[in-house]
């Protein structure tokens, strides 16, 4: 879990992305239908939990899936134990009557989208100690009675790179038959290697407190991006 801006560099596991891989791998060896799936609460939060219910036609196939699921959980735990020591996966098989499920073609497209959608960091600034420049976070995934929703939060301090990320998701949506909507957008705020106001701020801090100010760039949306877009040439820190 954590904030997808401030903590995306911690290499935290995203439960929605793990579920996408989980469903993909199960689908290679078993035939299931997706009854429902729900993961995450906010698009800008790294997903901590994701749960789903699958339907199998017979108990033998369900038992096979249970064994595969347990094996996959062990593989995931081994892969992420260094940064997610508290990872857990609960698996239960129950008997019941038939239920409504996501249509087969929609389910395949859904799983493929979850599996292939970019997530995490995909560009850093090596001149700034690996400062994150571009990332995305699959924050919410949910099936409803008549639609499937995937909410993603892409971030970049560079406008052109943000547009590149958006085009990737637009292409994925088109490929798998999803509609895409944009909301809550705000402009990026590129780091200025030279800043007179920053130099003045550092000098003033030194004079006032007798110590050096710690400067830190963060991969998160700030009002400065809005101000900088509205006032070209603004020197903001």
Where would I find each of the regions flagged by the language model?
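Glycine- and other small-residue-rich loops at beta-strand/loop junctions that grip anionic moieties
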Residues: 8, 190, 216
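Generic long, charged, amphipathic alpha-helical segments
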Residues: 174-208
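Short glycine/threonine-rich loop-to-helix capping motif typified by GTGT followed
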Residues: 43-51, 99-105, 190-203, 226-230
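C-terminal, non-catalytic macromolecule-binding modules
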Residues: 151-177
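A structural preference for short, hydrophobic beta-strand core positions in alpha/beta folds
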Residues: 36, 91-93, 180-184, 215-217
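Midchain, well-structured core segments that form catalytic/ion-binding scaffolds
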Residues: 1-154
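Zn-dependent metallopeptidase/amidohydrolase metal-coordination segment
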Residues: 129, 133-146, 153, 202-237
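Catalytic-loop motifs flanking and including active-site residues across diverse enzymes
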Residues: 15-19, 50, 165, 197, ...
């Amino acid at each position: 879990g954590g904030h997808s801006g401030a903590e995306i560099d911690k290499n935290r596991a995203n439960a929605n992305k793990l579920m996408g891989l989980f469903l993909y791998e199960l689908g290679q060896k078993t035939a299931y239908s997706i009854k429902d799936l729900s993961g995450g609460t906010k698009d800008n939060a790294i997903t901590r939990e994701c749960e789903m219910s699958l339907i199998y036609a017979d108990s033998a196939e369900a038992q096979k899936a249970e064994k595969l699921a347990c094996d996959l959980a062990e593989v995931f735990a081994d892969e992420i134990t260094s940064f997610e020591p508290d990872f857990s996966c609960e698996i239960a098989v129950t008997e019941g009557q038939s239920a409504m499920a996501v249509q087969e073609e929609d389910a395949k497209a859904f799983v493929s989208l979850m599996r292939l959608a970019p997530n995490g960091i995909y560009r850093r600034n090596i001149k700034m100690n690996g400062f994150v420049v571009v990332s995305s976070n699959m924050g919410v995934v949910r099936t409803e009675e008549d639609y499937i929703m995937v909410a993603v939060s892409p971030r970049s301090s560079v406008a052109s790179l943000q547009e590149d990320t958006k085009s990737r998701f637009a292409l994925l949506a088109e490929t798998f038959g999803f509609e895409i909507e944009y909301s809550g957008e705000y402009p990026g705020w590129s780091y200025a290697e030279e800043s007179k106001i920053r130099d003045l701020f550092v000098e003033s801090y030194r004079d006032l407190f007798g110590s050096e100010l710690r400067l830190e760039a963060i991969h998160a949306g700030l009002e400065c991006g809005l101000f900088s877009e509205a006032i070209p040439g603004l020197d903001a820190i």
